[in-house]
Amino acid sequence: MDNLVELPDEFVLPRYGGHCLADVMPAVARSLGLDDREWSGRSAPADPMAALPQARHWVVMLVDGMGRNLVEEHASLAPFLTRMNSIPDMTCAVPSTTATSLTCLGTGMEPGHHGTLGYTFRSPEGPIMNALSWANGPDPLTMQASPTAFERLAEHGVETFSIGPTGFVTSGLTQSGLRGPRYLSVRDEDDIDLRAELVADTLRGTTASVSYVYERSLDHVGHGSGCRSAQWRRRLTWTDELVEAIGEVLTPDSALVVTADHGMVDVPDDHMIIAEDQAGLLADVDELGGEPRTRHVYTDHPDEVAERWRSILADRAMVLTADQALHMGLLGKWDPAMRNRLGDVLAFMRGQWAVMTRQMPREMSLIGMHGSLTDDEMLIPLLYCEG
């Protein structure tokens, strides 16, 4: 099959190698005077993130679901975020989903290297796993054995902290892609002052430090109510207040960078395609993975299945074989050992369309979704300020 594919106008390719989420922690390491090239794979002397300030203490905050387009569209609701300095042209990785993105941030590696290839996908041990709940997941070190960015920073004497929900400290995703830092649990995630106090505590030491802060509520509201709902808009304003509170505790030798793991689109009920109800869509398909906006399709007949999905979905999706996706560089640097995890066919949904499956009934209640290549899902902010 021809590997040349015409990209739909609304699709954005990941900007690996300088303007992607995987490049954030290497940039922070460079700002601390460390040489990141051995572990990030960066070889070019130019630094796309050279605008980041020099600082002894860094706070790296990731707001789940806070796509760049959404922030710009609602700028009046996020005055502090809007005033922050910005590095443009940033994208998340592919697929545009939390598990993949958090592992990119935590390791400084691209998906094809770290191997967390979506929300659900075939685990190294065979069955479809859920990378958030870790259902059917292997030992986290089997999943991702390379040192994380936090572990590499610690090797150079940098203190590292992670500030997040209590239940995440022992999760498979944390232990796979974000392991290493001292974990500071947030028991009341609505308490802005508590979060700011925890950040302030990490800035008091004399040793250089990097503190990772994870905030998830905006994504949760977007999934349940829609990413342009009144509830979402209120939560964006709350998120802006949280970021401002963290900014206010910065010390003169510290800096804050704020980014996101993906954006979001709302999917109307009449744009939800139920796989089991589409004649022929599941023919020769062994398993479905991924999520509604990007499906991993596992099959022994990839060319035939890809053609069938293209015929049925038509202009509602870009359907690729795994070889085509890898040829396009969608997963970045590719480790062939990850091949069994990747779908043999990949369906990237266009517009506001989604492919649902009754095997994953919780999907049916979602309004806001992500995972595909539209600019609303792929473009993320990279904002920063100094103390």
PLM-predicted stretches and their roles:
Residues 1-387:
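Feature captures the catalytic ectodomains and active-site-proximal regions of enzymes
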